[in-house]
């Protein structure tokens, strides 16, 4: 099926843990709690394995996210790359393990700080305000407004506003907060927030709140939209005047390939918007693989209802592949690898981001 090795591997999506058969050749079983990638060399019947794994994990196991394995030249053994600290595992071969952040999750460029939103091509599409606070020296720490470069104090940005606070480098913490007008109270809120969340203030960013009603994840391989994971209907359970910030996901289906899925009246608008962004990103000249989450506004105070906006961007290597055409994605990725034999370790030129709802 593929001219070079590629294997699809599952990870638990709705549960915290799961046992997954990874390699039938060695009957390798292990507990997986974070994304894991598997690499086969051509010596391991790679074409048959790739096709079988694709069908097994993409089509038969429900409730799992799927990650893509990739080819490595001059290798004859399994290799695994993990995100996070997986405490225990059992293997029956001498496969090496790399703990922590894999090397293929490199920044787009040296100054990007592993965040796509700082890239000029993406900044133009962020239509909400986000402040990144770089110093916790005192309660008046200065943040930078993304897109304008304007400096702002914590109090100025939050006084009397509803803000979304999240961990900048991941998904470990997020909360919507209604801030009062009093600066001294805002100071206390952030002091408590840092203490109870366990996250150092520089690892948090503060954003204006958006209420999306439809969301679609577009999967991009080599600057081309290959498939999508849409139409996600987002509902915010209300508590008084506040949104909980949690999505009620009603449906997953591939808007690019499902002819019967017509429920999303905004899909064409969202796709054209995503394509416009992808075209701008392709001007970097890099072969980029990433996911782009696009949603529709439900708040005239932010923008006209029906206006698309960027919710989140992530590298393809650490994204949930919910509901997309996994075979189309795998095939596109395999073809890209054949077209770019000069790719170094990991073979996956990825971009990462902390732009989130």
Model-predicted regions and their roles:
Residues 218-220, 227, 302-322:
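A short beta-strand motif that forms the metal-chelation/ATP-contact edge
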